[in-house]
């Protein structure tokens, strides 16, 4: 059985390099975390994650604090960024961001594949909760990046 997949395509009226840099900017990643019981930490030595860096998300779900650590495993400046789970409740998690230049901006493609634990809780969470939750977080992150990239707000982060 194939892993569940989320595929989102977004037009952003901004150059690919700017969009790429905003996607990996820690302050925007932090803004995209939805709830008051959610936070992130990163191993990045600067304000932007790079190849090999980790990002750890902490969130309270189903009455329990949970952590997911992602590592940047693919990094093609201005073209592709991939985050993969190193530690967490899922069996697998992979989020690929692709950036395609077009005449009037960038097409950003987000592809997320994940695999749930095979136990009852994993199946239940996947059926009633996880896909919707992941889509909500990813769409929120896209909206924030788009808002910064298409306005003058990007200057405050990227100079």
Residue ranges and their predicted role:
Residues 1-46, 50:
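Hydrophobic ligand-binding cavity/cleft-lining segments
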Residues 5-7, 65-69, 92-95:
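Short, surface-exposed coil-to-beta transition loops
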Residues 7-13, 58, 71, 98-100, ...:
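Generic structural detector for well-ordered beta-strands
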Residues 12-14, 61-63, 74, 89, ...:
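Beta-strand elements of well-folded, non-transmembrane domains
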Residues 15-17, 74-80, 98-107:
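A short, structured loop/turn motif at beta-sheet edges
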Residues 40-87, 140-148, 154-159:
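Glycine-rich portal/gate segments that line the openings of hydrophobic small-molecule binding cavities
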Residues 84-136, 156:
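Beta-strand/loop substructures that line and gate deep hydrophobic ligand-binding cavities in soluble
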């Amino acid at each position: 059985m194939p892993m569940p997949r989320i595929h989102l395509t977004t037009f952003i009226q901004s150059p690919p390099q700017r969009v790429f840099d905003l996607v990996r900017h820690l302050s925007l990643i932090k803004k995209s975390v939805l709830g008051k019981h959610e936070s992130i930490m990163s191993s990045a030595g600067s304000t932007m994650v790079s190849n090999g860096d980790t990002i750890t998300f902490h969130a309270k779900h189903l009455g329990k604090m949970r952590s997911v650590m992602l590592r940047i495993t693919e990094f093609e400046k201005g073209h592709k960024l991939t985050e993969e789970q190193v530690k967490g409740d899922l069996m697998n998690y992979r989020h690929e961001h692709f950036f395609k230049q077009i005449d009037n901006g960038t097409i950003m493609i987000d592809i997320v594949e994940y695999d749930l634990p095979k136990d009852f809780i994993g199946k239940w969470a996947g059926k009633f909760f996880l896909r919707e939750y992941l889509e909500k977080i990813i769409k929120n992150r896209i909206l924030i990046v788009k808002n910064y990239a298409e306005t003058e707000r990007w200057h405050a982060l990227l100079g």
